[in-house]
C-alpha cells in the first residue's frame, strides 16, 4: 500500500554516516519497510553514567525517527550480565551475581524511562544465550579461525581474518610492529582475543567442549545479535569507545562464522567530556545519570543530549545543563503564550502531526533529521517556530500563534521533548527554584524569560517568575538599564 502522509517520500531520502565506509550513504534496509537494529547495551555492575545516557537517548532518537518515517523497527539492545567487572563487584559486595545484576538492570530501566526512552523490542541477556555462543565458537574452531590453548581458553586468531581492522582503520601488521603487548603463553598473536575463558574457582561456569568456563565479552554480542536479527542486519550501534576492539572483534567473529556481511551500517555515538576532560572516576568527574537527574529535570538532560549531533564530542558541565534548561523553558513558554491567548490546552493528534510535516518548517525538520539524524539542526528549527509564535502573539495574531504552536509540539514529539503539559513542566521548574538549586546562569535565564514575557504582555508569567525567584531567595531590581539580581 502506498503511503499518503507527508513523510511518504522522506523515507527514501534518509542518509546515515557509516563508520565502516567513513561517509554518509543512503539508507537501504535489507527488507523494504523494515529495520533491524542492534545496540551494545550496558554491563550491569553499577549505575549507568552520563555517557550511557547519551547512547540511550541517541539511539532512542534514531528509532523514533525511523518509526516516524514509517519503518517497522526491530530494536535490540543486549545486557551483559556476566563479565569480570560483575564478578569482582559481586565479590566485593558479598552479593550473589544474579542479585547484583538484577538490581542494576532495574536501575538502568528506571533511568532510561526517566530520560524518555522507549524500551527495546528485545533485550537479550548474555547468560540466556550460552548455547548460541558455544555453537559460534565451535564453528570458528572448525574453520580454523579459532584455537584452544593448553590453559583451557579458546582464542580467535586475528591473522586468519584478512579484513581485521577494516572498521577502526587499523592495520594488523602496523599494530604488531608498534605493540608493547606481551604475548600470553597460549596466544599465537598478542592481539588474539578470548572467546571462551577457562573456569576459575568461585566463578560462574558452564560445561563446554573445551571444559568448564564462560564466554568472552566479544562473542556475546555476535551470538545474540545473530540470534535476534539474523546473519546480516541493517544497523549496529554503540558508543565510540566500542569501535575498537569490541566492534572490530564482532565483525571478525561474525563474518568468519557465517560467511555473510555482519551489519550494513555502523553508528557510533561520540564521547562526553566533563568540563573539558575525559570522564573518569580517578579524576573525580564521574557522574551517574541519577546524580545528574537529582539536580536537573530529566527532560532537561534529554534536551541537552539531543542539542548536539550524536556523533560529535560533547562537553558536560553545569553551565551547559543550565543553558539547556533555559532553552527548553523558552520553548515551553512559547507554547504557554499560545495556549493562554487561545484559551485552550494544546493536544496533538495524528492529523496535526501530518499538518506539521506538510508545512514548510516541517520540511526543514525532515531535512535535518534525514541528514544522519541531525537533532541539533532539528532543534534549531523548533526555536525558529518559538520565535515566530512570540512575534504572532505580540501582534495579537492568535490563530497564527496557535497554528505555529501546533507545529512546534507536533514536530517535537518525534524527539520526545515538549510533550508534558505546559503547566506541569513549569510546576517542576518551580520545584527546582524552591529547592534553591539555581546557578547564576539559570537565574539569568529566568530573568530573560521574564523580560520576554513582559514584551509579549504576558504579565502573569512575568509575575510568576518574580515570585519563584523570591521564594528561592533571589531579589530582583528593575531599572531602565535592565534587571539586576542578588541573593537575599
Curated annotation (Swiss-Prot):
User: Which residue numbers does the motif 'KMSKS' region cover?
Assistant: 278-282
As cofactor, the record names: Zn(2+)
One of this protein's Pfam families, by short name?
Answer: DALR_2
Co-factor binding details: Binds 1 zinc ion per subunit.
Q: Where does Zn(2+) bind?
A: 40, 221, 246, 250
User: Which residues of this UniProt protein bind ATP?
Assistant: 281
**Disulfide cysteine pairs (residue numbers):** none
The protein here is known as Cysteine--tRNA ligase
Species of origin reads: Psychrobacter cryohalolentis (strain ATCC BAA-1226 / DSM 17306 / VKM B-2378 / K5)
Q: Which gene encodes it?
A: cysS
Amino acid at each position: 500500500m502506498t503511503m499518503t502522509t507527508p513523510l511518504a517520500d522522506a523515507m527514501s531520502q534518509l542518509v546515515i554516516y557509516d563508520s565502516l565506509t567513513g561517509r554518509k550513504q543512503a539508507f537501504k534496509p535489507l527488507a523494504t519497510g523494515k529495520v533491524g537494529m542492534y545496540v551494545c547495551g550496558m554491563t550491569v555492575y553499577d549505575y549507568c553514567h552520563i555517557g550511557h545516557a547519551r547512547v540511550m537517548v541517541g539511539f532512542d532518537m534514531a528509532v523514533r525517527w525511523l518509526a516516524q518515517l514509517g519503518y517497522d523497527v526491530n530494536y535490540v539492545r543486549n545486557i551483559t550480565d556476566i563479565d569480570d567487572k560483575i564478578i569482582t563487584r559481586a565479590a566485593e559486595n558479598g552479593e550473589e551475581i544474579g542479585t547484583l545484576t538484577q538490581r542494576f538492570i532495574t536501575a538502568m530501566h528506571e533511568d532510561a524511562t526517566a530520560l524518555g526512552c522507549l524500551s527495546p523490542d528485545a533485550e537479550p541477556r548474555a547468560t540466556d544465550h550460552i548455547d548460541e555462543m558455544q555453537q559460534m565458537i565451535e564453528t570458528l574452531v572448525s574453520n580454523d579461525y579459532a584455537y584452544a590453548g593448553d590453559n583451557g581458553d579458546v582464542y580467535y586468531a586475528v591473522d586468519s581474518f584478512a579484513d581485521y581492522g577494516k572498521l577502526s582503520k587499523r592495520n594488523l601488521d602496523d599494530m604488531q610492529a608498534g605493540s608493547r603487548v606481551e604475548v600470553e603463553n597460549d596466544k599465537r598473536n598478542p592481539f588474539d582475543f578470548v572467546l571462551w575463558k577457562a573456569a576459575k574457582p568461585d566463578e560462574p561456569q558452564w560445561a563446554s567442549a573445551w571444559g568448564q568456563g564462560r564466554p568472552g565479552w566479544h562473542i556475546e554480542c555476535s551470538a545474540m545479535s545473530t540470534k535476534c536479527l539474523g546473519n546480516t542486519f541493517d544497523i549496529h550501534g554503540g558508543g565510540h569507545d566500542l569501535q575498537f576492539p569490541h566492534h572490530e572483534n564482532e565483525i571478525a567473529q561474525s563474518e568468519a562464522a557465517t560467511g555473510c556481511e555482519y551489519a550494513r551500517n555502523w553508528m557510533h555515538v561520540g564521547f562526553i567530556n566533563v568540563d573539558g576532560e575525559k570522564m573518569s572516576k580517578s579524576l573525580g568527574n564521574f557522574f551517574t545519570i541519577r546524580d545528574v537527574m537529582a539536580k536537573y529535570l530529566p527532560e532537561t538532560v534529554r534536551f541537552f543530549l539531543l542539542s548536539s549531533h550524536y556523533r560529535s564530542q560533547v562537553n558536560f558541565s553545569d553551565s551547559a545543563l543550565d543553558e539547556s534548561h533555559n532553552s527548553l523553558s523558552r520553548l515551553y513558554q512559547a507554547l504557554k503564550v499560545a495556549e493562554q491567548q487561545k484559551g485552550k490546552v494544546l493536544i496533538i493528534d495524528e492529523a496535526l502531526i501530518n499538518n506539521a510535516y506538510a508545512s514548510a518548517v516541517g520540511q526543514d525538520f525532515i531535512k535535518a533529521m534525514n541528514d544522519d539524524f541531525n537533532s541539533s539542526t532539528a532543534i534549531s528549527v523548533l526555536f525558529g517556530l518559538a520565535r515566530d509564535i512570540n512575534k504572532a502573539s505580540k501582534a495579537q495574531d492568535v490563530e497564527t500563534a496557535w497554528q505555529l504552536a501546533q507545529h512546534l509540539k507536533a514536530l517535537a514529539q518525534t524527539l520526545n521533548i515538549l510533550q508534558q503539559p505546559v503547566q506541569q513542566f513549569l510546576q517542576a521548574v518551580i520545584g527546582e527554584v524552591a529547592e534553591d538549586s539555581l546557578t547564576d546562569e539559570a537565574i539569568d535565564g529566568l530573568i530573560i524569560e521574564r523580560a520576554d514575557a513582559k514584551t509579549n504582555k504576558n504579565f502573569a508569567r512575568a509575575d510568576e517568575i518574580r515570585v519563584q525567584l523570591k521564594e528561592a531567595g533571589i531579589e530582583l531590581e528593575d531599572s531602565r538599564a535592565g534587571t539586576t539580581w542578588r541573593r537575599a
